[in-house]
Amino acid sequence: MSEVIKFKKETKKEYVVDNQIRGRSYSSNHAKLLKHMDRLIDLQQGKRPRPVMFHMSPCNPCNLTCSFCCFANRAMKEMLTVEQMKSAIDQFTALGVTGMEFTGGGEPTLHPNLDEIIEYGYNKGLKMGICTNGSKLRKIKNWHMMSWVRLGMYSFDEKKPYEYHLDVFDGLDIEISAAYVWDGAMDTSTNPNITGEWLDDHAKKLATNEYKEENFMKMLAWVEEKKIPCRIAFNAIKDPKIVQQDIETIKVLIGKHEEKHGKLEYAFLSDFNFKGERRNNHCYMHGVKPCVFTDGNVYVCPSAELAPENLYQVNDEFKLCDIEGITDFYNSQVGGADVFRRHHDCSFCKYAYQNELIDDVLMPTKHNEFA
């Protein structure tokens, strides 16, 4: 496992800075996007977009039912074929994409052919990561081909907790991180996994996870003991005022833990991507991190369903093309901002700061000999 960087945390101000630095290493944000200046220059010059990475949702089945699931209205049995996944990999690598992330939909390790796809992507030269709830780690054999794994710290809130079999990573050069989602105010939740009001209730069941202070403290103790960086997030599919309340609750809980055990070294609050209001409806994420979903289509990003109005599912307005049309779609995006820019009015955009950064890159300005 890669060595984890430790930061000094002698003052609250220093801790906040360190928290932000670590957070920007383990999540999508504009600081990371700035590491890909070649992509931004291509967009500025009207060249064909070359996404930095792409997400792939191999399957929709999941062995958990979480209260915060942003795909609660998905078709539960849907999954990509081996041929579809290989075709997407072929086309994106031909476009110059170098990174791939397996994610949900459902729990990616439940796809029966995931090992085959990991090996295929590895042999194509892709750097690959995976977001998993961590309950089926022993099911996968090709962990040595992965660059990183992000474990969902959801066991701690389940009525029947499960074990994270970290021994599968022994001796491997793979970065292990974690993610936790705090979901307060469940009594006002609109998530179908809480209300039972799915668009289609086939194969659906109600959430069983519970949010208690003691569970949260156990989770913090675990990631600190295991020395695993853990981003602590919140359920964003709510009224922004309630989201802010959840953020404040997380801060209080972290404060209680630190009063007893000292400053956290590995867990950190991931609130720097939360932006209450967007500058405009401009969207460029298909040029950064498009998502191949289980229905065989490619979408603008993996997170449009985080906006409450999108009803916990992927919607047609965010569709770019089907898998076989990836190359043709990106070849059609040459010509600058007026060709490439999309307009989506998501009330919550996880990538609002990145979109604003690209907006600024594309903004025409005079006297550019000066800065």
Task: Describe each PLM feature range.
Residues M1-M76, T93, G287-K289, N297, ...:
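N-terminal pre-core extensions flanking Radical SAM catalytic domains
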Residues S2-T11, D38-G46, E175, D187-A307, ...:
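A C-terminal junction/extension of Radical SAM enzymes
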Residues V52-S57, H111-N113, I117, G121-L126, ...:
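Short acidic, glycine/proline-enriched helix-loop-strand junctions
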Residues S57, E101, C131-T132, Y180, ...:
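Short beta-strand segments
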Residues N60-N63, N133, M186, N310:
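Asparagine-centered polar/low-complexity signal
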Residues F71, M79-T103, E107-N235:
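Radical SAM/AdoMet-radical enzyme domain recognition
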Residues A75-L80, L306-L311:
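A short local loop/turn or secondary-structure capping micro-motif enriched for an aromatic residue
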Residues Y180, A236, S270-N273, A337-R341, ...:
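Acidic carboxylate-rich catalytic motifs and surrounding loops in phosphoryl-/glycosyl-chemistry enzymes
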